[in-house]
């Protein structure tokens, strides 16, 4: 009875067991999931730093900017983990790889520019955030297209 899990046949039928995945798919899935987990850990650290280390040092508006960076950082760290799991379950198509890559770029550009803006007050960094936001949008659209293309 140990091997009678109700989803076992279903998972195997959909090619989701590790043995049925190609090496590239496993590498991509591991990269996305582990990167997402590390990025999430960093997001938690940045959130704690903002709440405890920056509260007395930043103006309220700049603290809000920092918090916005943390929020999008965390949403998209979880998005990276999700994309990695989808890659593991469905295989790592080009669209899924691009989705993961753009999500990571979005975190770096969007959240990163907000972090630096909050710390330095350098206004031109606000112009970088939309590039990161566009990366997020394209990443989610590519993921949707990749899922719609699966049979």
Q: What residue ranges belong to the model's regions?
A:
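Polytopic transmembrane helical bundles with strong interfacial aromatic enrichment
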Residues: 23-151
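A generic alpha-helix propensity feature with a strong bias for hydrophobic helices
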Residues: 8-9, 133
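Absolute N-terminal positional cue centered near the fourth residue
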Residues: 4-5, 31
């Amino acid at each position: 009875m140990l091997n009678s899990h109700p989803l076992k046949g279903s998972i195997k039928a959909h090619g989701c067991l590790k043995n049925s995945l190609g090496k590239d798919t496993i590498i991509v899935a591991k990269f996305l999931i582990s990167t997402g987990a590390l990025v999430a850990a960093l997001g938690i650290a940045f959130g704690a730093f903002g709440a405890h280390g920056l509260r007395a040092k930043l103006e309220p508006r700049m603290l809000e900017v920092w918090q916005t960076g943390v929020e999008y950082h965390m949403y998209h760290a979880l998005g990276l983990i999700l994309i990695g799991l989808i890659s593991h379950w469905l295989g790592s198509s080009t669209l899924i790889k691009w989705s993961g890559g753009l999500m990571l770029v979005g975190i770096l550009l969007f959240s990163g520019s907000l972090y630096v803006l909050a710390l330095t007050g350098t206004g031109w960094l606000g112009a970088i955030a939309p590039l990161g936001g566009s990366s997020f949008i394209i990443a989610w659209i590519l993921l949707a297209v990749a899922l719609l293309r699966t049979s």
